[in-house]
């Protein structure tokens, strides 16, 4: 990763665009597919790089910035549940200084002179849930989803042992939130059963819990050893208690499982002592934890602190360092992705790290192999932080055998044998053979049918590979003529290995169902390089309809300047992504394929959904010292209500909130005849909003 201190604005913009798409893909894999693609530590590193870039270049913050979002858009197989209060993620602290900074921010924000008590509890490595009770009866269970809309898992959550279906002496409407998990020993037993039944094993306890909870058939969930802890309320917690410790006591009285391992800390020293205790004893716990959560104990103070885009200000997660192991590097294989990117993968002698058997690790790019001087038969250090794909940290040079073998970067594509064009300085190496490369074509079709694209259930990797190998499909369009081809063929799909009458019927139904698709999902399904879900949404918003989109994209091939300018003006579409879009639509076959898809699909026009308030899009300026609230708190409240907080007064300013000793900004506001109010009027205004 580039040095943030030395990076130019142009480089920063490109990197922010790349990070937005990359992190969005990782979020989807983790939250929706229960299949993390990178380690926690690598994800955190990418996310922190994004934050540092945004802090240095705030004017470059993208609409689809990862810092504004949590989780991922939910899949379509479950009904949607809107969270009345968003289920946001937590910011991370990686060392003691980060924790001290967290405590200091609380003091500054709230203007406190003393340490405010902090509630400390283990961070369970499971799946977050919400459960709603009306008149004491469980009515809705939901996953976090994207933080705003989750999946309805009511039937499944009711199968969990000791999960209350009915509770007494509570408000008419009660929401509790917590974590569903599988204990370590239960995970090992479950994987043993999976293996005996010839089914795929789960990667880790979290994946097992997530996969078990997100079953369409609740009888399958009922057979899984799921457990839970509740750790907060949603819209009702202040009706039950005035602090976190009181709330958990009340929830326990209601019959919920709470984690008894906790600490109400009255100093930083007590916080760190609890962290060290859990870090030392984590292996002795029956379940996996990956850190400690710190929350302001007082709910009134929590409310004053509020939230930023994706996390609360009043809480943070102090992460544990990753688990380190050592094993032998057996070989290095190369994968070819849908856009032609070649990625090296380390094949390892299987090793158990933190209860999970690891046999592969991504090497990200070929420069990393040279930089770390990795050789086949080397003994390497692995880092794992609770997820499926570990990271190779380096080589144990003291144990290097005499017969190690260096890895030669390929000169030709391992799939189509076309020559790879790159220089030794290139980080990313690609095959430029496009859809003539079997590996790229396979990955493109698999991407097209994936959950967040066309979402054709029943077409996983194995099925796509089978259909291509049998010559039944060769491009995305062929999928929609598969039934017609099968009906007229003597060799029926249902009679082939791995298929049956029911599975084929369901597949054809799902293909037909997928023909109704939103414009953002359709654009994402095309597999344009660097066009992830968020950038696909940007394009859909810009062009509105399929017909306008394809017409404008055809103009790209005629070098029409207006369309270049329109794309260039889109926030989030930089020069690099613009080149990728142009390259994609410069291929005549791509245009023809999209047109044919447009003839058989019902592609819905883009629809914007946005909540409004009387302050939405209003430009507000704060000046002077506010008597009872900090400037940070005032700004946070304004932004929460949809206002845009500016640092200077201009003719575009809608409102100025003036405190004590307001100077030139107040004077300019008067000159421009802009509405001016004091803190008391501001507090009344936001209360009424």
Curated annotation (Swiss-Prot):
The active site is at residue 123. Its cofactor is Mg(2+); Mn(2+). GO terms for biological process: DNA repair; DNA replication. Residues 610-689 form the BRCT domain. Zn(2+) binds at residues 413, 416, 431, 437. DNA ligase that catalyzes the formation of phosphodiester linkages between 5'-phosphoryl and 3'-hydroxyl groups in double-stranded DNA using NAD as a coenzyme and as the energy source for the reaction. It is essential for DNA replication and repair of damaged DNA. This is DNA ligase.
């Amino acid at each position: 990763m580039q040095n943030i201190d030395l990076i130019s604005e142009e480089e920063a913009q490109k990197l922010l665009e790349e990070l937005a798409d990359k992190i969005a893909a990782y979020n989807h894999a983790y939250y929706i597919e229960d299949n993390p693609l990178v380690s926690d530590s690598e994800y955190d590193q990418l996310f922190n790089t994004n934050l540092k870039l945004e802090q240095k270049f705030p004017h470059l913050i993208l609409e689809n910035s990862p810092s504004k979002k949590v989780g991922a858009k939910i899949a379509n197989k479950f009904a949607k549940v809107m969270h009345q209060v968003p289920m946001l993620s937590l910011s991370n602290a990686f060392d003691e200084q980060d924790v001290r900074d967290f405590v200091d921010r609380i003091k500054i924000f709230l203007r406190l002179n003393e340490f405010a008590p902090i509630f400390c509890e283990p961070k369970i490595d499971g799946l977050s849930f919400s459960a709603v009770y009306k008149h004491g009866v469980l009515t809705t269970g939901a996953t976090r989803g994207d933080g705003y809309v989750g999946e309805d898992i009511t039937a499944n959550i009711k199968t969990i042992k000791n999960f209350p279906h009915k509770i007494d002496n509570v408000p008419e409407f009660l929401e509790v939130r917590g974590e569903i998990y599988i204990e370590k020993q239960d995970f090992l037993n479950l994987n043993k059963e999976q293996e005996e039944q010839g089914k795929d094993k789960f990667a880790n306890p979290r994946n097992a819990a997530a996969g078990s909870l997100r079953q369409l058939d609740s009888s399958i969930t009922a057979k899984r050893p799921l457990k839970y802890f509740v750790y907060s309320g949603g819209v009702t917690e202040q009706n039950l208690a005035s602090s976190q410790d009181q709330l958990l006591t009340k929830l326990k009285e209601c019959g919920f499982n709470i984690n008894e391992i906790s600490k109400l800390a009255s100093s930083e020293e007590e916080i760190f002592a609890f962290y060290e205790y859990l870090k030392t004893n984590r292996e002795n716990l029956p379940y996996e934890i990956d850190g400690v959560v710190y929350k302001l104990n007082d709910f009134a103070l929590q409310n004053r602190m509020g939230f930023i885009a994706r996390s609360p200000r009043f809480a943070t997660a102090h992460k544990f360092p990753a688990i380190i192991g050592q094993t032998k590097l057996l070989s290095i294989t190369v994968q070819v992705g849908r856009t032609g990117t070649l990625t090296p993968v380390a094949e390892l002698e299987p090793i158990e790290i933190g209860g999970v058997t690891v046999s592969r690790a991504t090497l990200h790019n070929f420069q990393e192999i040279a930089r770390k001087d990795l050789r086949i038969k080397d003994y390497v250090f692995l880092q794992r932080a609770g997820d499926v794909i570990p990271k190779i940290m380096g080589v144990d040079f003291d144990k290097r055998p005499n017969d190690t073998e260096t890895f030669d970067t390929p000169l030709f594509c391992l799939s189509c044998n076309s020559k790879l064009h790159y220089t030794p300085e290139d980080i990313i190496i690609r095959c430029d053979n496009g859809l003539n490369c079997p590996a790229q074509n396979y990955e493109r079709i698999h991407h097209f049918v994936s959950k967040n694209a066309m979402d054709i259930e029943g077409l996983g990797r194995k099925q796509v590979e089978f259909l291509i190998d049998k010559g039944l499909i060769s491009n995305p369009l062929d999928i929609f003529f598969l039934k017609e081809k099968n009906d007229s063929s003597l060799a029926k799909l249902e009679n082939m290995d791995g298929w049956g009458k029911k599975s084929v019927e369901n597949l054809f139904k799902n293909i037909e169902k997928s023909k109704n698709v939103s414009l953002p999902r359709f654009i994402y399904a095309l597999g344009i390089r660097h066009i992830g879900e968020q950038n696909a949404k940007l394009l859909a918003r810009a062009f509105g309809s399929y017909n306008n989109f394809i017409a404008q994209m055809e103009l790209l091939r005629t070098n029409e300047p207006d369309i270049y300018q329109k794309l260039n003006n889109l926030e989030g579409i930089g020069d690099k992504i613009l080149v990728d879009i142009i390259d994609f639509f410069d291929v005549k076959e791509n245009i023809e394929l999209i047109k044919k898809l447009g003839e058989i699909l019902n592609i819905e026009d883009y629809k914007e959904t946005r909540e409004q308030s009387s302050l939405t899009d209003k430009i507000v300026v704060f000046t002077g010292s506010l008597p009872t609230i900090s400037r940070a708190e005032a700004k946070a409240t304004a932004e929460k209500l949809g206002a845009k907080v500016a640092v200077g007064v201009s003719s575009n300013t809608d409102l100025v909130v003036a405190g004590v000793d307001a100077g030139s900004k107040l004077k300019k506001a008067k000159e421009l005849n802009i509405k001016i109010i004091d803190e008391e009027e501001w507090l009344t205004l936001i209360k009424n909003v």
